[in-house]
Amino acid sequence: MGLDEKEIDRRVRSAAYFVGLRDDQLDKSPFELSGGQKRRVAIAGVIAMEPKVLILDEPTAGLDPRGREAILAQLRSYHKQKGNTVILVSHSMEEIARNVDRIVVMSHSHKLMDGTPEEVFSRADELLQVGLDVPQVTKVAMELQKRGLLADSSVYTIDELVRRLLALKGGEAAC
């Protein structure tokens, strides 16, 4: 990368701080780190290179809910602060629904869908047909639609489902 030691040190410390690692953790053997700390070290190592496009494959796999949310919050912050593209490869549609503004669905090396979370999850039946899951809240909305309680099931967040149900309660159409 052609960087001097001072710049490398600055980037490493900045990336470590960014992902929530303390200075004393940087000196530890990888065998002394927890799974979440190892994941943060790996992400910090890539962030230190300041890529314009950051591609992460299952970055939260094996982490507890708190660790998953911390990593995802850091990635959202990275995207927001740097303006760089972050691509998440994941089978967790719950995480995807809450953390991205665009979804590309691939199956057998072919692009099946490309759109906003709302656009993609409005095609929940197709996602299920190709073996992908949908957010639990979408499944609830699908069941409510089957029972005639919702006009459509293109819901992917709890807040949106609550909004629609409250609109129904108030006598307004929820579609």
Map each language-model feature to its residues:
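Conserved ABC ATPase "signature" region
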Residues: E7-D24
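Conserved ABC ATPase signature
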Residues: S29-L33, Q37
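Hydrophobic anchor residue at the start of the ABC signature
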Residues: I43
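Conserved catalytic motifs of ABC-family nucleotide-binding domains
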Residues: E50
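Catalytic Walker B motif of ABC-type/P-loop ATPase nucleotide-binding domains
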Residues: L54-D57
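A short, surface-exposed alpha-helical micro-motif characterized by mixed small hydrophobic
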Residues: I96-R98
